[in-house]
């Protein structure tokens, strides 16, 4: 969107930047005008101009971005970015299902069985902010392609934040951006279901290695389409002169890895926390995180996570809520799968069928969100999501021995898709709209880092709960104890969303963060100029 030329106007004030743009279009400010309009005419003119600006903003929020020369170019871009969600969820969900087969074939000890599932989320969580900064430095295009071409663990850490960055940069606030982010959430659901479907087929009929060959083929196809259709923003991003905070990045990555490792491994060492290296690594990790906070807050010129990002209304509370919500989801997916197979006796393909409501419900909810986000307050959707986060693990925590699928598992699947799909799109749209284009990589890194860190921490803590109670309570009760922990995280998340989510309104068409900042600067300039002229007279 090109902003209207902001003419010097003596009546402009810095208090309302929108007035500056409106007054700049007022015919009364034209020096060639031969007659000064009356007061009533001014009111009428300014009302018409305001309506026309609102109409223009609404139109721009619905139009295809000018960077795409055709609809096919836009569709190619959308497909390429949405595939990042499919690839990530494919490896998250399917790996949980294929894990029992993998443990048996590779003879992985029970004490180490949680690591294959935890390591993926841990690596992504620890490095997302780093790759988000690389996206802001070098552009989403090269970092996105790098993630698709590289390792399974580090790859999503590269293409997840830059995927959000590309959408947030290309699309301005409005229904079209809401639709793309809704599709982004929908493809996460499709990837989730496709992952467990492929894992079920592979685990039951052919060798488990084919699961990874399928993932590699999908990544290759996405790499080709991305190279063709994703806009190359390298030159534009390099103009921002953003640099990497390497000391802060190193301390953050090492600190997160050591803390999560100590928490997770403590459940399987012979003496638990009395094993010398467990508290040692935990303390070293905490010290490194404190060092990272010091570097980020007082040393680094361009910190990975600037403190002023949390000055955005309710940013801190929503970040914590997102951490708790995805920890809740991680527990449900891993221990729900183990409960279905080991306690309820479901085969891999039966588990696929049992998770069908998650896929169908997610697709339906995300399609509805595309048409409701600019009409329904985001706060209401967050409250519904919080209720789902409490209800889904609660049902599995209460299911009796021999409980049926339709009475317990089916409604829990419906509730879990409500919690994840409603919250993700709302928070993504809110955060990317609040931040300027130079920080879209940061937005993507923060969102996905918090999500994956929530999963890694929650799985580590729930593994402690399950391991410490299995001998006394039995396998079934130990699984249900993890679901009670998920109920606690869901309840805390709900409280945060109810109280602080009120700041999240409707995702209507609006000026971008960059345009708002430009108007505020122009308003301040006009106000300063007006005071100088008054003082001179």
Where are these regions (language model features)?
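Cytosolic juxtamembrane N-terminal segment immediately preceding the first transmembrane helix
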Residues: 2-90, 104, 527-534
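Transmembrane core module of solute transporters
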Residues: 79-83, 90, 95-100, 107, ...
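Interfacial helix-cap and linker-helix signal at transmembrane-aqueous boundaries
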Residues: 102-103, 134-135, 198-206, 263, ...
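Loop-to-transmembrane helix entry/capping segments in MFS-fold secondary transporters
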Residues: 110-111, 174-184, 348-349, 435-447
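Central cavity-lining transmembrane alpha-helices of secondary-active solute carriers
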Residues: 118-133, 160-164, 356-369
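Helix-loop-helix hairpins in multi-pass membrane proteins, especially solute transporters
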Residues: 128-130, 134-247
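Hydrophobic transmembrane-helix bundles of small-molecule transporters
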Residues: 206-320
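A late C-terminal transmembrane helix in Major Facilitator Superfamily
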Residues: 434-471
């Amino acid at each position: 969107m090109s902003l209207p030329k902001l003419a010097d106007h003596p009546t402009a004030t810095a208090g309302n930047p929108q007035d500056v743009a409106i007054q700049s279009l007022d015919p009364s400010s034209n020096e060639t005008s031969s007659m000064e309009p009356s007061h009533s005419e001014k009111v009428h003119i300014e009302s018409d101009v305001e309506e026309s600006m609102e109409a223009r903003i609404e139109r721009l929020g619905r139009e295809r971005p000018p960077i795409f020369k055709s609809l096919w170019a836009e569709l190619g871009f959308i497909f390429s970015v949405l595939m990042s969600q499919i690839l990530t969820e494919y490896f998250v969900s399917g790996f949980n299902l294929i894990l029992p087969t993998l443990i048996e074939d590779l003879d992985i000890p029970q004490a180490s069985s949680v690591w294959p599932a935890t390591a993926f989320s841990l690596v992504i969580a620890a490095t997302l902010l780093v790759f988000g900064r690389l996206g802001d430095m070098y552009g989403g295009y090269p970092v996105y392609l790098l993630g698709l071409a590289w390792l399974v663990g580090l790859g999503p850490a590269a293409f997840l934040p830059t995927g959000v960055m590309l959408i947030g940069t290309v699309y301005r606030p409005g229904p079209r951006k809401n639709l793309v982010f809704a599709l982004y959430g929908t493809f996460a659901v499709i990837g989730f279901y496709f992952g467990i479907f492929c894992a079920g087929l592979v685990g039951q009929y052919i060798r488990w290695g084919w699961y990874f060959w399928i993932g590699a083929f999908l990544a290759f196809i996405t790499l080709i389409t991305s190279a063709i259709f994703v806009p190359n923003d390298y030159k534009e991003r390099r103009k921002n002169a953003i640099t990497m905070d390497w000391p802060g990045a190193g301390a953050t990555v090492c600190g997160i890895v050591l803390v999560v490792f100590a928490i997770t491994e403590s459940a399987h060492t012979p003496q638990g926390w009395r094993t010398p290296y467990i508290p040692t690594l935990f303390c070293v990790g905490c010290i490194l995180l404190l060092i990272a906070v010091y570097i980020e807050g007082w040393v680094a010129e361009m910190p990975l996570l600037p403190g002023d990002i949390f000055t955005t209304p309710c940013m801190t509370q929503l970040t914590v809520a997102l951490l708790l919500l995805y920890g809740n989801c991680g527990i449900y997916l891993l221990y729900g799968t183990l409960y279905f197979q080991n306690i309820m006796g479901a085969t891999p393909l039966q588990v696929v069928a049992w998770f069908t409501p998650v896929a169908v419900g997610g697709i339906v909810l995300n399609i509805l969100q595309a048409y409701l986000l600019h009409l329904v307050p985001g706060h209401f959707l967050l409250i519904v999501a919080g209720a789902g986060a409490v209800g889904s693990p609660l049902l599995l925590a209460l299911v009796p021995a021999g409980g049926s699928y339709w009475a317990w598992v089916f409604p829990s699947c419906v509730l879990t898709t409500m919690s994840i799909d409603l919250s993700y799109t709302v928070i993504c749209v809110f955060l990317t709209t609040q931040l300027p284009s130079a920080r879209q990589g940061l937005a993507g890194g923060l969102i996905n880092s918090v999500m994956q860190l929530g999963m890694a921490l929650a799985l580590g803590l729930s593994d402690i709960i399950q391991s410490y109670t299995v001998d006394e309570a039995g396998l079934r009760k130990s699984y249900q104890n993890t679901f009670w922990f998920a109920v606690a995280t869901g309840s805390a998340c709900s409280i945060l969303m109810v109280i602080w989510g009120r700041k999240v309104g409707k995702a209507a068409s609006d000026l971008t963060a960059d345009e708002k900042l430009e108007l505020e600067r122009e308003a301040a300039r006009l106000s300063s100029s007006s005071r100088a002229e008054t003082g001179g007279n």
